[in-house]
Every structure is written in structure tokens, then in C-alpha cells.
UniProtKB/Swiss-Prot annotation:
InterPro entries: Syntaphilin/Syntabulin (IPR028197). It is found in: Membrane; Synapse, Synaptosome. It comes from Homo sapiens (Human). Inhibits SNARE complex formation by absorbing free STX1A. The modification Phosphoserine is found at residues 200, 204, 219. Residues 7-49, 230-246 have a biased composition (Low complexity). Keywords: Coiled coil, Membrane, Phosphoprotein, Synapse, Synaptosome, Transmembrane, Transmembrane helix. It is a single-pass membrane protein. Residues 1-75, 191-246, 338-398 are annotated as: Disordered. This is Syntaphilin. The modification Phosphothreonine is found at residue 214. Binds to STX1A. Interacts with DNM1; this interaction inhibits the binding of DNM1 to AMPH and DNM1-receptor-mediated endocytosis. The gene is SNPH. The keyword Cell membrane does not apply. GO terms for molecular function: syntaxin-1 binding.
Length: 494
């Protein structure tokens, strides 16, 4: 019996070793680590198990000789093992799909953030470009403003320079005028002391012949012939004729001297006319304070006084000239005819009784004094100096012409009839229609109440004037264009 026990143990151990499944079968599907107790527990009591269930447990390691117990999956059939593997793969696939969906949502969120960032970046770039363009435009405007400021400054500087130069020229001309007047006063005082004779009723020639006097020709051959050779006035006249003042190309002639004295002694305000006189005549440097100048003035005054002391025939002719010179002409005529002559005093009322000037406002009188009546000479536009050799008579001849003044032009313009219509029809039409436009617009926009009229009296009148504007303008222009009767000028013999 003792001998049979070891044999039975060996057979049981050998059978147990043969029936144990190999390790390769268990690891063929790689599911040994993924076994579950629930799946394996259902097959414990089944008869299909390849190996019988153990009836006892080994308590010692030496009982199984160091071999590990098998896993529960090794007791499943291959079909069951495939089903378990498919379940595990489905679960893993589901987890992978969930992860993929999560990642897709994250990618979508990132894309939306990226699109927002791109939009913000584009908007910022647009703002930056707009700011750059605005900065460039501002710089251009600043440059243009700087250029405008520079041009304005340059213009102001040029104007200031011109004004300063103008004031300097005015001061220079005033100084020249003062020196000229002073020299003339000195010459007159010297002449009064030398001659001791009384002055004429109008004073010196500079006072008797005003700036507004007309063309006057004084010829005195009889007086010059009756004078003695030793007369100081005749001698001074001869000295003046022989001096350098007789040459018209180099120095000032007698006519220029008398004309300058008459222009400067007329009592006019010192303004722009002084500047024009000085710039046109240039009397300052051409009038030296010398004995020749004094003799010339003495000779001229003596000639004028001698011509006033004789009875002469005066012929007046009407010519075109300024309207406000009649009074001055009358004074000049009275001063020359009845200034110092007691015999001619009876004829002065006769001169006053007749009209001193023409009725035509644009005409003046040419006075000719002499033994023989000569034809009236035309008025020139400026001073006409005459040489002694060109005049057949030995007497003096003076011509003074005053240019048109602004005050006289304004007076003539005031006398003209005023017209309330312009030259263009469109301007008058707009002037009549435009004030009625707001009323018409208000009438069109506002809601008209019941019983309220749709017209406005002013707009209605303007509409009527607009319709008849052409005829109104024609009638007014025709009434203004009617010529006013004006008497024609003629000649009179005194």
C-alpha cells in the first residue's frame, strides 16, 4: 500500500501537468490582463471546462512546485474570448471617439478665437493706416499753412516797406516845398524893398493867378516900348531873358516860373496833389535862391501891373472846361482889369453884371488881353512853356491848365440821374424773385387750414413784378435816357 501511494501521486501529477493549458494559448489574444471576475464566474460550474475544478487549495508553495495559478480567461472557449475582446475594443473605440469629439470642440474654439484675433488685428491695422493718412494730411496742411503765413508775412513786409518809402518821399517833398516857399517869400520881400511900389489888388502874380485859372495871354508891347532903358523892371526882365532861365531844355522858363508860383500859392491842402506837383514839375532843385531868380520875379510882376494899368479889350470864348472855375475866373479878370487902375473902376460893375461863366457846366472861358484881339488858342493838357524867340510879341504869355479833380467828378456824378435797375436783366429778376422763395417754400410745406388763403400779398406783388419786369425796366430806362435841355455856349464881346 505504501508502494502504491507514490505511484498514484505520480500519475495524478502527470495528468495534471498534461491537462494544464500552455501559456501561449492564454497570451494569444492578449486578454489575460483584461479578464473580469463576473465573466469568469459564470462558467465555473459548467461541465464544458477542459479541466476539473480543484477540490482543495495548496497551502504551501511546495505543493504546486512554484507554478502560478492560471487566470480565469483560460477557462473560456475561444468564441467567448473573442466576444470579450470585441467588447473591450468597442469600449476603447468609444473612449477614443469621445476624446476626438472633445478635441474637435477645442479646435473649433481655437478657430473662433483665431478669427476674432484676425478681425481685431485687421481693424487695428485699418485704424493705424487711417491715422497715418490723417497724419500725412495734417502735415501737408501744416506745410500749406506755413507757406500761406510766409507769403502773408512777405506781403506785409513789402507793404510796410512801400508805406515807409511813401512817407519818406512825402517828407522829402514837404521839405522841398518849404524851401521853395521860403525862397519865394525872400524874393518877394527883396523885390518890395528894391522897387518900393505898391502891389496889385490881387497881390503878387503868384496870388493873382491861381491854380484853377484858365489860359491867359498877357502881351504888353506898348508898355515895354514906353519904358525907359534905365527902368529897373525892364532891366530885370532883360536880365531874366538873358539868363539861363530862357533855355527850355536846361532850366525853367518864365512861363514855368509863373505857373509854379500860381500853383503853389492857391491855398490847396498839402497832400497827394503836392506830391504829384513835385513829381511832375520838380521845382525844388530847379529854383535856386539867386539874384537872377529875384530879378525874374520882379520883371514878371512889373509886366503884369503895367498890363493891368492900360485899357484893353477882353474877348471871352466858351470852351469845354471844368464847371466850378467860373468864380475863380471872375476874380482873376477883376484883379487884372480893375486891380490898381482907378479909371477902369467904372467898368467893374459892368463885368459883374454880365455872367462870368458859361451856362454849360463842362465849359470854361478863355481870356485874351491885348491891344489886338487874337483867335482863342486851344487848351492843352499840361504846362506849355514858350521860348522868347518863338513869340512874335515882346510881351509875356502864360498858360496854366489844371487837371480834372476828383471832387468835380463826384459833383458831376451826383448830377446824373440815378437808376434803380442794373444793366443785366437776370440780376433784377433775381432781386425781385429771391425774397419770395422762403414764403413759397413755407406755403408748399405747411398744411393749409380750411378758410386760410394760399397767397401772400408781398409774394403776389413780387410775382406781378416778375411777370411785368421787362416792361418796367424798359419804361424806367426810357425815362432816364431822355436828354435834358441844355443851352449851347456862345461867344460874347465885352
Amino acid at each position: 500500500m505504501a508502494m502504491s501511494l507514490p505511484g498514484s501521486r505520480r500519475t495524478s501529477a502527470g495528468s495534471r501537468r498534461r491537462t494544464s493549458p500552455p501559456v501561449s494559448v492564454r497570451d494569444a489574444y492578449g486578454t489575460s490582463s483584461l479578464s473580469s471576475s463576473s465573466n469568469s464566474g459564470s462558467y465555473k460550474g459548467s461541465d464544458s471546462s477542459p479541466t476539473p475544478r480543484r477540490s482543495m487549495k495548496y497551502t504551501l508553495c511546495s505543493d504546486n512546485h512554484g507554478i502560478k495559478p492560471p487566470t480565469p480567461e483560460q477557462y473560456l472557449t475561444p468564441l467567448q474570448q473573442k466576444e470579450v475582446c470585441i467588447r473591450h475594443l468597442k469600449a476603447r473605440l468609444k473612449d477614443t471617439q469621445d476624446r476626438l469629439q472633445d478635441r474637435d470642440t477645442e479646435i473649433d474654439d481655437l478657430k473662433t478665437q483665431l478669427s476674432r484675433m484676425q478681425e481685431d488685428w485687421i481693424e487695428e491695422e485699418c485704424h493705424r493706416v487711417e491715422a497715418q493718412l490723417a497724419l500725412k494730411e495734417a502735415r501737408k496742411e501744416i506745410k500749406q499753412l506755413k507757406q500761406v503765413i510766409d507769403t502773408v508775412k512777405n506781403n506785409l513786409i513789402d507793404k510796410d516797406k512801400g508805406l515807409q518809402k511813401y512817407f519818406v518821399d512825402i517828407n522829402i517833398q514837404n521839405k522841398k516845398l518849404e524851401t521853395l516857399l521860403h525862397s519865394m517869400e525872400v524874393a518877394q520881400n527883396g523885390m518890395a524893398k528894391e522897387d518900393g511900389t505898391g502891389e496889385s489888388a490881387g497881390g503878387s502874380p503868384a496870388r493873382s493867378l491861381t491854380r484853377s485859372s484858365t489860359y491867359t495871354k498877357l502881351s504888353d508891347p506898348a508898355v515895354c516900348g514906353d519904358r525907359q532903358p534905365g527902368d529897373p523892371s525892364s532891366g530885370s526882365a532883360e536880365d531874366g531873358a538873358d539868363s539861363g532861365f530862357a533855355a527850355a531844355d536846361d532850366t525853367l522858363s518864365r512861363t514855368d516860373a509863373l505857373e509854379a508860383s500860381s500853383l503853389l500859392s492857391s491855398g490847396v491842402d498839402c497832400g497827394t496833389e503836392e506830391t504829384s506837383l513835385h513829381s511832375s514839375f520838380g521845382l525844388g532843385p530847379r529854383f535856386p535862391a539867386s539874384n537872377t531868380y529875384e530879378k525874374l520875379l520882379c520883371g514878371m510882376e512889373a509886366g503884369v501891373q503895367a498890363s493891368c494899368m492900360q485899357e484893353r479889350a477882353i474877348q471871352t470864348d466858351f470852351v469845354q472846361y471844368q464847371p466850378d472855375l467860373d468864380t475863380i475866373l471872375e476874380k482873376v479878370t477883376q484883379a487884372q482889369v480893375c486891380g490898381t487902375d482907378p479909371e477902369s473902376g467904372d467898368r467893374c460893375p459892368e463885368l459883374d453884371a454880365h455872367p462870368s461863366g458859361p451856362r454849360d457846366p463842362n465849359s470854361a472861358v478863355v481870356v485874351t488881353v491885348g491891344d489886338e484881339l487874337e483867335a482863342p488858342e486851344p487848351i492843352t493838357r499840361g504846362p506849355t512853356p514858350q521860348r522868347p524867340g518863338a513869340n512874335p510879341n515882346p510881351g509875356q504869355s502864360v498858360s496854366v491848365v489844371c487837371p480834372m479833380e476828383e471832387e468835380e467828378e463826384a459833383a458831376v456824378a451826383e448830377k446824373e440821374p440815378k437808376s434803380y435797375w442794373s444793366r443785366h436783366y437776370i440780376v433784377d429778376l433775381l432781386a425781385v424773385v429771391v425774397p419770395a422763395v422762403p414764403t413759397v417754400a413755407w406755403l408748399c410745406r405747411s398744411q393749409r387750414r380750411q378758410g386760410q388763403p394760399i397767397y401772400n400779398i408781398s409774394s403776389l406783388l413780387r410775382g406781378c413784378c416778375t411777370v411785368a419786369l421787362h416792361s418796367i425796366r424798359r419804361i424806367s430806362c426810357r425815362s432816364l435816357s431822355q436828354p435834358s435841355p441844355s443851352p449851347a455856349g456862345g461867344g460874347s464881346q465885352l
